[in-house]
């Protein structure tokens, strides 16, 4: 144990010297999430009537109660949440409704489709739905190879089937959860400079 402690101390000292850069990870998380949330929110706001119909219709939509309110909350949370993430303002607070939005999306929209966003029968996370998609994809390829410009169609990437599982929603939730605990990050966020100005949270690694 003494040898382990002796070896640990200098290594920990090196890590402590790197603490000045501990705001980099929160910054990159924010820059990754901000355009995703902004785009999702803007799509809902710019097609608000269609969004409300999808939220409320029980046959081909989500069948949620109070669809106007739910659509407005989801769209506003994503769009304005994306703006706050971008500038690093109230990041820990806005992470909460954004996480709730991701949970609602995962449970009400994506859960029945399993984990995978893109159907990949070779994945060990593939469910029965994904395995069945392999035959559909093979038939689609055969039709396009026989009757379409297959080389041109696949010139920018392979044909895939969207499975629409919880993969993206769960990933965004984990990233937001990290921001909830770490904050917006040192030096590159409005939160950090507000904390310094007010004397609140200045002793934490990330504001």
Model segments located where?
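Perimembrane loop-to-helix junctions flanking transmembrane segments
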Residues: 52-66
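Extended, low-polarity transmembrane helix blocks
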Residues: 1-49, 65-76, 80, 87-207
């Amino acid at each position: 144990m003494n040898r382990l402690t002796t070896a640990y101390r200098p290594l920990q000292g090196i890590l402590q010297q790197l603490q000045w850069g501990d705001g980099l990870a929160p910054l990159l998380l924010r820059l990754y999430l901000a355009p995703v949330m902004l785009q999702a929110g803007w799509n809902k706001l710019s097609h608000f009537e269609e969004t409300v119909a999808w939220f409320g219709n029980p046959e081909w939509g989500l069948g949620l109660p109070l669809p106007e309110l739910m659509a407005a909350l989801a769209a506003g949370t994503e769009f304005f949440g994306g703006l706050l993430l971008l500038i690093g303002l109230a990041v820990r607070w806005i992470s909460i409704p954004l996480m709730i939005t991701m949970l609602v999306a995962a449970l009400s929209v994506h859960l029945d489709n399993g984990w995978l966003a893109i159907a990949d029968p070779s994945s060990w996370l593939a469910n029965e739905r994904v395995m069945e998609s392999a035959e559909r994809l093979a038939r689609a390829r055969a039709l396009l190879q026989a009757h379409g410009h297959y080389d041109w169609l696949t010139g920018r990437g392979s044909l895939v089937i969207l499975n629409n599982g919880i993969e993206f929603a769960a990933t965004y939730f984990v990233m937001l959860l990290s921001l909830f605990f770490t904050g917006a990050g040192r030096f590159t966020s409005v939160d950090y400079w507000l904390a310094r100005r007010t004397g609140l949270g200045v002793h934490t690694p990330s504001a």
